Amino acid sequence: TLDEADRRVLEAMLKQAAEEKATAKKNKALAKKYYKQFFSSENADNMKLVFYSEGSGYYKYFKNLIEAILEKSDITIHYVTSDPNDAIFKKNEKQIIPYYVDENRLISLMMKLECNIVVMTTPDLEKYHIKRSKVKRNIEYIYLDHGCSSLNLTYRTGALDYFNTIFAVSREQAIEVREIEKLRGTKKKKIVEYGYGLIDTMIKDYEASGKPVNEKKTILIAPSWQYDNIMDSCLDDLVEGLYGRGYK
């Protein structure tokens, strides 16, 4: 027989499982509704521009570009997200139409696109579940990087091969794209030296903040992704060495 503690744990697990099942059912119905809306007859002749986002946290990489489109044009943005709780659904902007699509429907949605342009921060187009459209072959696929590092050092081989246009965060990255094309023998892409909107936003927000001076200096530890980075190799010693020195 279960003792009281075990019984409570079991009840909590069963409750969590039931909640997860209910949420999954709700999200499945939501995805079905948005998928149907996306391919509605109303959209068929009017859909020009599609953004794809992996989740709510990715909007910040699109933000500056989207705001420029809203300010300078009347183009409707069809914003597809894999996150049912994406903050995009709370935006009251008539030029943005958001859709939640689950992973299974995302595969067919991408293959059936008939828009003119797709913008995404997700690399590896055509290599995994996200494919170019099989219905309209001349869609322009734009890759907008969500980092500001080396494409060659951080992505898989061929991660950008199937994009038509790269929004480069720097001139160095633009040069790197050309060198990758030469090395792999792939077709030349359009390159737009776009910069990195997230940093632009951070600078703007800082300038508007009045530049407050913190009483304590804050140390930001930012490990890289490679093997034996700070987190794996020396984090404990590093943090211990900073104790009691007046830092936050």
Where are these regions (language model features)?
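Non-catalytic N-terminal targeting/anchoring module and adjacent flexible stem/linker
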Residues: 1-50, 71
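Generic detector of well-ordered alpha-helical segments enriched in charged/polar residues
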Residues: 10-14, 28, 32-36, 87-90, ...
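Short amphipathic alpha-helical segments, especially helix-boundary/capping motifs
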Residues: 38-44, 150-155, 214-216
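Short, flexible hinge/linker loops that cap or flank conserved catalytic cores
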Residues: 43, 135, 160, 212-213
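Active-site and donor-binding regions of nucleotide-sugar-utilizing enzymes
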Residues: 50-203
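Conserved catalytic-core segment of nucleotide-activated headgroup transferases in glycan assembly
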Residues: 58-74, 197-248
